[in-house]
Amino acid sequence: MAVPKRKMSRSNTRSRRSQWKAAEETLVTSTVRGQVAYSRPHTARVVTDSAGTPLYLEYKGRKVKDL
């Protein structure tokens, strides 16, 4: 493990840490029953019945897993 040769000042430490930013989450749009739905890419979608009960997971139009 690398060991720093000198102590890093509080100012330099904080300015270095301030450059780190969380990446904005990417969303994919899909149309479900005539409504636009946003979801994360490469994740399965939960298919529900009219009462809202989850039935199964769907990915790229295929049934993946029963719930």
From Swiss-Prot:
Q: Looking at the record, which segments are called Disordered?
A: 1-22
A cellular component term (GO) from this record?
Answer: large ribosomal subunit
Protein family according to the UniProt entry: Belongs to the bacterial ribosomal protein bL32 family.
- What is the species listed in this Swiss-Prot or TrEMBL entry? Kineococcus radiotolerans (strain ATCC BAA-149 / DSM 14245 / SRS30216)
Is Nucleotide-binding a UniProt keyword of this protein? no
Q: Which domain of life is it from?
A: Bacteria
What is a biological process (GO) this protein takes part in? translation
- Tell me one GO molecular function of this protein: structural constituent of ribosome
Organism lineage reads as: Bacteria, Bacillati, Actinomycetota, Actinomycetes, Kineosporiales
Q: What is this protein called?
A: Large ribosomal subunit protein bL32
Sorted UniProt keywords: Ribonucleoprotein, Ribosomal protein
Which InterPro entries would you find in this protein's record?
Ribosomal_bL32, Ribosomal_zn-bd
Residue ranges, compositional bias (Basic residues): 1-19
* HAMAP family assigned to the protein according to its UniProt record, in alphabetical order: Ribosomal_bL32
Q: A Pfam family for this UniProt protein?
A: Ribosomal_L32p
